[in-house]
Amino acid sequence: MIIEPRYCGPPDVGNGGYVGGLLAAHVDPAGAAEVTLRRPVPLGVELTVKSEGNGQAVLLNGTELVAEASALAIRQEVRSPKDGFGVLGSPPPASVAAAQAREAGRRAGPRVNREQHPFPGCFVCGPDRGPADGGLGIIPGPLPGRDLLADEWRPGEELAGENGQVRTEFVWAALDCAGGHGAIQPGLPPYVLGRLKVRPLRPVLAGHSYVVVGWLLAIGGRKIAAGSVVYNSSGKAAAVALGTWLPLPGAAPRPEAPAGDAPDGAAAAG
């Protein structure tokens, strides 16, 4: 496995969700897995995927452990908003209309002021990237009156396999950055993904409109837990994720957002 430089998160490091999705596909065909990142993932370097059996695999850079994946044991279809979300431990927020998510994305602080983004070159959510150069263009913004951030996502054909479904690594990448934006507010130091657990529920199809949301779940010591969901146009969850984030060592806090830019839950994140 080689992570191409265009799939970066922080500078010179692979996007955690993208890498996690690639590794998850080695333990579960649908990408239902938990991936733990043990060290920054280098770009343009040949890495080795080693199956450990029993639905487990590791990613190695030479002899160094980079990441490890475990398949989720139970897969459920969602029949109501309260079913099948054991990954989060609680029901997710209600879905958001695409028009509302689109407007929230336009209000996103990093989209208005790139200095608010710790990694503006991130291929998923960086303001310096976009669909024209292979970026996903997902920059969630605050929804008035709700403790979550959202953006619309219309994945292009280039992200899909032959069946028209968006490949696992790109769905994971979208969930990764949505959760990060939802939980880690301006004023906090930059955080990086440590662990991501994803349960795919329905196909994500290229060319269709989706809503991606992220929100704060909990803060424990240095760690922040974030939830994220990709909703389809019917308001049903296509994929749900739980992410654990860790502060980047030695990083300075980000600039504060202008008044009104942060969601209602921002104070809890601080």
Language model segments and positions:
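Conserved mixed alpha/beta catalytic, RNA-binding, or beta-rich assembly cores of soluble enzyme
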Residues: 137-148, 161, 168-182, 187-189, ...
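Non-catalytic linker/capping segments at the edges of enzyme domains
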Residues: 1, 54-58, 70-164, 263-270
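Solvent-exposed residues in well-ordered beta-strands and their adjoining turns
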Residues: 4, 52, 72-74, 154-156, ...
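Short hinge/gating elements
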Residues: 5-9, 160-161
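Extended, compositionally biased flexible segments
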Residues: 25-91
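Hydrophobic beta-strand-centered segment that forms part of the acyl-chain substrate-binding groove
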Residues: 7, 11, 19-54, 176-211, ...
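Accessory, usually C-terminal, subdomains that scaffold auxiliary metal cofactors
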Residues: 189, 197-260
